[in-house]
């Protein structure tokens, strides 16, 4: 959807869940369609992409100015005296939390509020992230 904020236009695009349907041990089928979503963007205005899981970031083209994601809950289990124990991501701690910049592409991964897969959250305070957009 093309939005206009005081004369500054930008696209807000969203993806379906990448892990929507469980098909067996360690295998999910998603309902995300990155190519189809980006195909609907018809101008050169900046794009903000909303994605539940941050793992899609490796496929996001430079055309997208910012990707916003969650799902990892900041690593979910983080102890100060040990390396990160578990993160619900194919990439481990790489996309667990924060502002990530890779090859000029930007993604913010929120720690969120709950937990994922394992009903436990330690060392990662819940959060709601507010993003202020500017020129």
Regions found by a protein language model. Give the residues of each.
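Soluble catalytic domains of enzymes that build or remodel membrane lipids, polysaccharides, and related
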Residues: 1-135
């Amino acid at each position: 959807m093309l939005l206009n904020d005081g004369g500054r236009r930008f696209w807000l695009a969203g993806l379906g869940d990448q892990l929507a349907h469980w098909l067996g041990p360690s295998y999910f089928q998603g309902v995300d369609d990155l190519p189809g979503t980006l195909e609907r963007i018809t101008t050169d205005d900046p794009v903000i992409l909303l994605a539940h899981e941050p793992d899609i970031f490796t496929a996001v083209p430079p055309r997208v100015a910012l990707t916003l994601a969650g799902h990892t809950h900041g690593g979910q289990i983080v102890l100060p005296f040990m390396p990160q124990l578990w993160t619900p991501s194919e990439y481990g701690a790489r996309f667990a939390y924060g502002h990530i910049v890779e090859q000029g592409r930007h993604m913010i991964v929120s720690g969120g509020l709950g937990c994922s897969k394992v009903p436990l959250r330690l060392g990662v305070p819940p959060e709601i992230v507010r993003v202020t957009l500017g020129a």
